[in-house]
Amino acid sequence: ARRYMQKVRGEDRYEIITFRQSFHGRTLATLTATGQDKVKDGFAPLPAGFYDQAVYNDIESVRAAINDRTCAVMLELVQAEGGVIPADPQFVKELRRLCDERGLLLIFDEVQTGMGRTGSLFAYEQYGVEPDIFTVAKGLGNGFPIGAMLGKAKLREAFGPGSHATTFG
């Protein structure tokens, strides 16, 4: 999302809105995106560029968090570690509309919900809302440590050979 805004749209927008009680991983960037202080404890200083205090299922909270640096909104369609809380379908639809209105990318973290774990290949299919970017892992590798980020065709302009890497090097 950051790279797309800077390389393709020429905008200095880098902040990603995430949600309280979310969990996005344990790398430095993904734990910074996580909305749980207990996960971040002991890792300061954390990288800038994430706002992790939006209230899940509250569109007004997201609207209030958007500023001129915001490039994307990222959420889990089911907050697993946050208490197994599913996103409200109306909230997800409103979030898509809001992102479109404000020129933001919508990112779904499908690490826990993707690959058939919710009854469809990806949970977003059940919401009738298509993200700009989504991530998958866990179920993708069936125990093998692998993950993927998938995005709409418009995003490929931001990536060329060598601009995105793998942990397998």
Identify what each model region corresponds to.
Residues 1-169:
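Conserved N-terminal phosphate-binding loop of PLP-dependent enzymes in the Aspartate aminotransferase
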